[in-house]
């Protein structure tokens, strides 16, 4: 375990993330430009695909970080049976949900019930599939829909704000089931689908297209919102949410509806819109 990961056990997660949020939304020219230039240089951010390629045109660091892409910079897989990758990033892990457990790293796993904050909500995904995608600081930070779905409920699960970088994934037990997260449940033509937005150290917020800012939310109680009857339908490939700094999204699918696309595995670099899995039609 690295020194940084060890320190995250004792660091004041909330205070540091609150400070990061204040900096991210600062419109002081010197502050925001220093942050933009530092992150661009350190992580090799490619602005040529951005709708606004001029790093000095962004009013805040957060505006830079949640930047839109040019039209056509990402296109969905042409196969109508393809469920799409929800974001740019890197596969942390993916595979079957076996006996209700989701693989995190060698020697590490957690239950779907822990992740979703509800054993009943987890039951339909037993023996299904999961994919965990890590968004690094250089990546496009909007999350899109793998498949067309109608929003049913969201569940805010309070928790810690550990780093979700590779070292933390290898060494922090049940990491994604311990960090603060927003669980989004959708109804689709094949049954339930869940997308889980996992918070992390220095993540200054998670926003959804239907409700705005969802994280940070203070308190220690699980909060559920019921959207049934609201008619919130998000089409395949449509934007769903965004991270106001890098983090992780986990997609859960029920059993018997899809097979994972060949060539995907842990550490695979992925792009929004490529095939994640393919429907088992007929």
UniProtKB/Swiss-Prot annotation:
GO terms for molecular function: phosphatidylserine decarboxylase activity. It is an enzyme of class 4 (lyase). Belongs to the phosphatidylserine decarboxylase family. PSD-B subfamily. Prokaryotic type I sub-subfamily. NCBIfam families: PS_decarb. The record marks 246-247 as: Cleavage (non-hydrolytic). InterPro entries: PS_Dcarbxylase, PSD-B, PSD_type1_pro. Keywords: Cell membrane, Decarboxylase, Lipid biosynthesis, Lipid metabolism, Lyase, Membrane, Phospholipid biosynthesis, Phospholipid metabolism, Pyruvate, Zymogen. One of its GO terms (biological process) is phosphatidylethanolamine biosynthetic process. Pathway: Phospholipid metabolism; phosphatidylethanolamine biosynthesis; phosphatidylethanolamine from CDP-diacylglycerol: step 2/2. This is Phosphatidylserine decarboxylase proenzyme. The modification Pyruvic acid (Ser) is found at residue 247. PANTHER family: PHOSPHATIDYLSERINE DECARBOXYLASE, PHOSPHATIDYLSERINE DECARBOXYLASE PROENZYME, MITOCHONDRIAL. It comes from Xanthomonas oryzae pv. oryzae (strain MAFF 311018). It catalyses: a 1,2-diacyl-sn-glycero-3-phospho-L-serine + H(+) = a 1,2-diacyl-sn-glycero-3-phosphoethanolamine + CO2. GO terms for cellular component: plasma membrane. Is synthesized initially as an inactive proenzyme. Formation of the active enzyme involves a self-maturation process in which the active site pyruvoyl group is generated from an internal serine residue via an autocatalytic post-translational modification. Two non-identical subunits are generated from the proenzyme in this reaction, and the pyruvate is formed at the N-terminus of the alpha chain, which is derived from the carboxyl end of the proenzyme. It comes from the Bacteria. The active site is at residues 88, 144, 247. Catalyzes the formation of phosphatidylethanolamine (PtdEtn) from phosphatidylserine (PtdSer). Binds 1 pyruvoyl group covalently per subunit. Its main location: membrane. It is found in: Cell membrane.
């Amino acid at each position: 375990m690295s020194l940084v990961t060890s320190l995250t056990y004792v660091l004041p997660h909330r205070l540091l993330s609150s400070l990061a949020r204040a900096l991210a939304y600062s419109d002081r020219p010197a502050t925001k430009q220093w942050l933009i230039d530092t992150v661009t240089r350190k992580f090799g951010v490619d602005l040529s695909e951005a709708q606004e390629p001029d790093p000095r045109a962004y009013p805040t660091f957060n505006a830079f970080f949640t930047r839109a892409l040019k039209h056509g910079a990402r296109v969905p897989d042409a196969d109508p049976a393809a469920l799409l990758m929800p974001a740019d990033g890197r596969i942390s892990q993916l595979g079957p949900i076996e006996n209700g457990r989701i693989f995190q790293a060698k020697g590490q796993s957690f239950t779907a019930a822990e992740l979703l904050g509800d054993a009943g909500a987890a039951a339909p995904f037993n023996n299904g599939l999961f994919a965990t995608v890590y968004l690094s600081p250089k990546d496009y930070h909007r999350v899109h829909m793998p498949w067309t779905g109608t929003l049913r409920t969201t569940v805010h699960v309070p928790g810690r704000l550990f780093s979700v970088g590779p070292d933390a994934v290898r060494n922090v037990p049940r990491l994604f089931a311990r960090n603060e997260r927003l669980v989004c449940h959708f109804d689709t033509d094949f049954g339930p689908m869940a997308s889980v937005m996992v918070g992390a150290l220095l993540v200054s917020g998670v926003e959804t297209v239907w409700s705005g800012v969802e994280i940070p939310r203070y308190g220690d109680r699980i909060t559920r919102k019921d959207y049934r009857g609201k008619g919130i339908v998000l089409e395949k490939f449509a934007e769903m949410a965004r991270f106001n700094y890098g983090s992780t999204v986990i997609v859960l699918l029920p059993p018997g509806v899809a097979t994972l696309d060949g060539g995907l595995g842990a550490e695979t670099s992925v792009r929004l819109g490529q095939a994640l899995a393919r429907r088992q039609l007929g």
